[in-house]
Amino acid sequence: MLALTRKKGESLVINNDIEITILEIRGDQIKLGVSAPKEVPIYRKEVYTQIQQENRKSADAQNAQALKELFG
């Protein structure tokens, strides 16, 4: 993992088209601004993890249904 130090108002750029800016620092919280193309999905980690879990459940259910139909 790359660790960088930034101050309020400073940014970093990822892959030439994603910019992350430190908007505010208050106590132990940091407010980030993210500029990225619309086709780049951006999620908080806890939301992303939940989406992955739901996708796995859905895929498992679809696979189970396909097996039932195949072997009836």
Curated annotation (Swiss-Prot):
The highest taxon in the source lineage is Bacteria
What is the disulfide pattern of this chain?
none
| Keyword annotations from UniProtKB, A to Z | Bacterial flagellum biogenesis, Cytoplasm, Repressor, RNA-binding, Translation regulation
Q: Mention one GO biological process in which this protein takes part, according to its record.
A: mRNA catabolic process
Q: Where in the cell is it found?
A: Cytoplasm
Q: What are the GO cellular component annotations?
A: cytosol
Family annotation (PANTHER family): CARBON STORAGE REGULATOR
The UniProt entry's sequence similarity note says: Belongs to the CsrA/RsmA family.
Q: What is this protein called?
A: Translational regulator CsrA
Q: Which organism is it from?
A: Agathobacter rectalis (strain ATCC 33656 / DSM 3377 / JCM 17463 / KCTC 5835 / VPI 0990)
